[in-house]
């Protein structure tokens, strides 16, 4: 899905998603139901420290969320200019890391 469009309010992995819609749709593909907004995702699963993060954890920031890939990177719907892509997990201050599986 890398390079697919960012669409505010979107939940389509092919036609466009925003950050929380992207995360929600990826996890739904694997049978895991998540709330729709970043703020509601801050309380799902179990909190872990960034040092304990493993691939598949979600990392939440102030108004943003991505899926941890390992090796210090997240996959996420970045913005309308960049679409879905990869960023360093520590590109900004982390609010919480949540383990869902």
What are these regions (language model features)?
Residues 32, 36-50, 63, 69-101:
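Aromatic- and glycine-rich peptidoglycan recognition patches
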């Amino acid at each position: 899905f890398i390079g697919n469009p960012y669409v505010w309010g979107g939940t389509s992995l092919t036609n466009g998603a925003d950050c929380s819609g992207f995360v929600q749709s990826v996890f739904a593909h694997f049978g895991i139901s998540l709330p729709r907004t970043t703020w509601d995702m801050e309380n799902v699963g179990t909190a872990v420290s960034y040092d304990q993060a493993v691939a598949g954890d979600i990392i939440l920031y102030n108004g943003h969320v991505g899926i941890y890939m390992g090796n210090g990177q997240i996959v996420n719907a970045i913005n309308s200019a960049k679409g879905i892509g990869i960023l360093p997990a520590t590109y900004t201050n982390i609010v919480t890391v949540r383990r869902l599986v």
